[in-house]
């Protein structure tokens, strides 16, 4: 059984609000860079880029980071298999930039920690801010988002399923019971 948390219109409103908050907090966006965490974070970053361009008339660079190599909670089945860093693409030097790291759902904080490691390997940003569509709680690390589309308290027996039209053909966020 699933329960709808955000529909297409609510996701659009949340990303528009986050875009305004990014502009306000940074007093403009001249030194900002948007970086999406693969996979859905990239599409959210592109949507934020469009919203910010509509509001400010500035097209921010958008990068992507694939944190596969950095995950500390991956289970590797064979000792010969190692996670591979793939597809990380940040079009400008992060040094001195205000980097807005973007993901769909914030849960334990491990994915964000891994993304921070990947970003720091690319240079020394002036500041890193975190934007998420959904914050579901249950943090295992001291990570807190700067921008949140919606806080959705959950139990550990529930999961948040974020779907974006670019990947899934529909924009919606649902909460579901985990299946064992």
From Swiss-Prot:
It catalyses: UMP + diphosphate = 5-phospho-alpha-D-ribose 1-diphosphate + uracil. Its EC number is 2.4.2.9. Substrate binds at residues 39-40, 103-111, 136. The keyword Transcription applies. GO terms for biological process: DNA-templated transcription termination. Regulates transcriptional attenuation of the pyrimidine nucleotide (pyr) operon by binding in a uridine-dependent manner to specific sites on pyr mRNA. This disrupts an antiterminator hairpin in the RNA and favors formation of a downstream transcription terminator, leading to a reduced expression of downstream genes. This is Bifunctional protein PyrR. It comes from Halalkalibacterium halodurans (strain ATCC BAA-125 / DSM 18197 / FERM 7344 / JCM 9153 / C-125). The lineage of its organism: Bacteria, Bacillati, Bacillota, Bacilli, Bacillales.
């Amino acid at each position: 059984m699933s329960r709808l948390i955000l529909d297409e219109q609510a996701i659009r409103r949340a990303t528009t609000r986050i875009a305004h908050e990014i502009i306000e907090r940074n007093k403009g966006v001249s030194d900002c860079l948007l970086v999406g965490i693969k996979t859905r974070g990239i599409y959210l970053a592109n949507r934020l880029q469009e919203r910010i361009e509509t509001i400010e008339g500035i097209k921010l660079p958008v990068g992507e980071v694939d944190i596969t190599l950095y995950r500390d909670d991956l289970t590797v089945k064979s000792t010969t298999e190692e996670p591979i860093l793939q597809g990380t693409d940040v079009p400008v030097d992060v040094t001195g930039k205000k980097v807005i790291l973007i993901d769909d759902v914030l849960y334990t904080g491990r994915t964000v920690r891994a993304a921070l490691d990947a970003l720091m390997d690319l240079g020394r940003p002036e500041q890193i801010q975190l934007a998420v569509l959904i914050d579901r709680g249950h943090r295992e690390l001291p990570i807190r988002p700067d921008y949140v589309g919606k806080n959705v308290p959950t139990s550990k027996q529930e999961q948040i399923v974020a779907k974006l039209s670019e990947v899934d053909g529909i924009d919606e966020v649902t909460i579901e019971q985990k299946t064992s």
